[in-house]
Amino acid sequence: MKIRFTKMQGCGNDYVYVNGFTEHIPQEKKPEFVRFASDRHFGVGGDGVIFINPSDEADFEMEMYNADGTRAEMCGNGIRCVAKYAHDKGLTDRARFSIISGGKVKYMELTVENGVTKAIRVD
């Protein structure tokens, strides 16, 4: 299985980010993929994997997994990286948008300079 990903960190929390709009892993295979990708000796390495998905309840869904393959609800640094990824990779051109994670909607406000996200406020 070939999956394109991006490795990002926010204040020391490092995750593997997967664009769920273009990359598809069956739900039942995700825990195994997460464990492999998160392994710092044999995989990419990270605190876990975050899938950036479409959502009916917000502009994006942050589907977050811990390194052991279990689901997680929220990481403040992780959601900031999702916001930066979504804007910088062209998933949105708006500086204000919403992300749902763990059943809760959070609102992002980005500071963008020359097309690059420089700061993110989460409400």
Write out the residue ranges for each language-model feature.
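A glycine-rich beta-to-alpha transition motif near the start of alpha/beta enzyme domains, typified by
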Residues: 1-116
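Short, solvent-exposed secondary-structure boundary/capping segments
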Residues: 116-123
